[in-house]
Amino acid sequence: MTHYCGINRMKEGTDFEKKHTPFIECKDRVKANDYFEVKISTGIPHPMEDNHFIHWIELYMGDLYLARVDFTQFMKPEVKLMVKAPSKEHEKFILRALMRCNLHGVWEYEKEILLE
């Protein structure tokens, strides 16, 4: 049963929040239409037990769905994806990651990327 409703975001930087926030690691600047690596993981390792684990991670470019990776308690909630940057018609874009803990709900993190 999930005890948290809606989408949660890190506010105070507590260990609890860091265990549930899907941090995005990638370049701050990328070339338009080029592929670049995006790593998504928790800031602090999250328990992966039968009754408490990260269920999935989703990645979006703004509101555009890119990918979803599902996990079981036998996996590390971390993923690396190759993402294609948008065309140069924009100066920047937002990557948005969502992560769901089976007990503590959905957590979100955003990162702004500049286009070269």
Curated annotation (Swiss-Prot):
Gene3D superfamilies: SOR catalytic domain. Its cofactor is Fe cation. The keyword Lipid biosynthesis does not apply. Fe cation binds at H20, H46, H52, C101, H104. It catalyses: reduced [rubredoxin] + superoxide + 2 H(+) = oxidized [rubredoxin] + H2O2. Keywords: Electron transport, Iron, Metal-binding, Oxidoreductase, Transport. Its EC number is 1.15.1.2. One of its GO terms (molecular function) is superoxide reductase activity. Belongs to the desulfoferrodoxin family. Uses electrons from reduced NADP, by way of rubredoxin and an oxidoreductase, to catalyze the reduction of superoxide to hydrogen peroxide. This is Putative superoxide reductase. It comes from Methanocaldococcus jannaschii (strain ATCC 43067 / DSM 2661 / JAL-1 / JCM 10045 / NBRC 100440) (Methanococcus jannaschii). The lineage of its organism: Archaea, Methanobacteriati, Methanobacteriota, Methanomada group, Methanococci.
